[in-house]
Amino acid sequence: MKKKLSSIAGLTLVEILIAVVISSLMMAAMFTSYSIVNSTYRQVTDRAKISQAGRDLVGQILREVRMAGYKYINDDIPASTSHNPIKITKGTGIGSSCDKVEIVFGGIEYDKGATEGDRFSYTRYKITYECKKSTIIDDTIPGGATLIEGFAVYKSKHRWNTTSSSWSDPATDSDETTYEDEKILDYVQDLVFIPFDEDGRIIAGSPAPSDSAAYEVKSVDISIVVRSSKAFYRSKAMRTITSIATGRDISKDDKYFRDSITVTANTRNLGI
């Protein structure tokens, strides 16, 4: 009987302890692997979100730069320097100001209740993109009163008033498509616009172009630098973002990720 019980005996205490240790090591290894993969995945998705936010804004500006100067064939609105297709006011970069762009193009409205021949009326719109200091609190600095170093991009749309020969106030112009400054994107580090003529030369000055050269802009380089909202890297390091504008490189010793997006928009309605 003793021999039979011996042959079906379970694990000894030592064997059980060894099994527990091995299982614990395996679980620790699996958790470590998961943490590494999860951290890497989170970094990749965070980077993608930051880049996508910048690309969405640049794509929007690009489409409207292409609209600059557009008018309908029978447009009868008197010409004015206020209707210059593109006007770029230069900034100096992070810590001070971004570039500002104003884009003007024509529109048309149809009133089926009007008499034939008077059913169409022409309009003029101005789109403006400009930066203002960000109002987000920097939670890495004690006190809760320090703002982050950066900007928020705002967009506005105004309609031309042919009676007063001025841009109307969106709050009182009865046009539902116009609006005053609306925030489009925050955590912006810089926004740059560089106009070029047909020979590929930079049109200098601020604002640019001048009234006499208003229709000489053939393309505009658009560049934006966007920062992550939270620390991205594990440790601080000096990282530099090279700007397309002279003297506006961004060098920061911190943990934030910055992405630069640059595109070229052709002003297809100018010089036609």
Where are these regions (language model features)?
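Hydrophobic, aliphatic-enriched repeat segments that assemble into extended interaction scaffolds
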Residues: 57-58, 62-65, 101, 212-224
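Short linear sequence signals and composition-biased patches located at protein termini or domain-edge surfaces
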Residues: 94, 171, 176-272
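Surface-exposed loop/linker segments characteristic of extracytoplasmic
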Residues: 82-198, 219, 262
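Residue-level marker of positions within ordered structural domains that often coincide
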Residues: 35, 66, 70, 108, ...
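Acidic surface patches and DE-rich sequence motifs
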Residues: 7, 73, 197
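Aliphatic-rich helix starts adjacent to a transmembrane/signal segment
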Residues: 2-4, 8-70, 272
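Short, glycine/small-hydrophobic-rich surface segments
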Residues: 65-100, 205, 237
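Exposed loop/turn and edge beta-strand positions of beta-sandwich/beta-sheet ligand-binding modules
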Residues: 16, 123, 213-216
